[in-house]
Amino acid sequence: MIDKNFKNGCVLVVGGSGGIGSICAKEFAEAGANVAITYCKNKKKATDVASDINPKVKIFQLDNQDPESVERVMNDAAKEFGSINTIVNAAGFDIPQKFINEIDIDLWKSVMDADINGFFNLVKSGLPHLRKSKGSIVFISSAGLFKYPPGDVLSVAPKATIEHVLKGIAKEEGHNGIRANSIALGIIDTGIFHRLREEENTFFDDAWHEAVLNTLALKRFGFPEEVAHTAVFLASSKAGYITGHSLPVDGGYHI
């Protein structure tokens, strides 16, 4: 059944050509939404993802570090579909697993800039569109916010800032009908996790694999479809009274 929140406009999935983003895009399309996805460099992958989902899916190249690029994509997506009803931020990149004392200032600055400023650019350009549609933001975050995993500060620290920005949006923009929520991910069996596991001399060796499984109540890693189902729910009318919330999808890691 098509959710009323998806009847008009589109769902813009930032990072929609990636492992989790592409599955989110597919789930939104199956829920009846018009879908637009963004990519940074790999146009072929984005084109393949779009064609696999639905010929009507539109792709846009986006550099979220460039405010003009973000503004252009927001306006083009809104023009193509009439409006934007949901922004899903599923963009991600391989972040080094380092302990705090191993991180130099240049690496720290580059990660903070990419994650925090990139998200803020999306918010700054997206809010005018979401005010018109009374739409929502869904941010793909980390369960490390609830239970810190040593060596993961470069992932968790910027997301902690973004979580407070989301709460600010929920508080300040609620009267405009805008909702803002996040999904706090545990280990999801796709994308970046696969690449990191395949690297030699990686932090993510077999011992790490077993140790993490032992911390999970459900004793398995998550599937991208489970993340996508949650994203669709949070953006739908069924979650119409939920805002400013971070929903763990982590197999019980945070317990």
Locate predicted features.
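Conserved NAD(P)H cofactor-binding loop of Rossmann-fold oxidoreductase domains
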Residues: 90-96, 252
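Catalytic loop of short-chain dehydrogenase/reductase
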Residues: 92-94, 136-162, 166-175, 187-188, ...
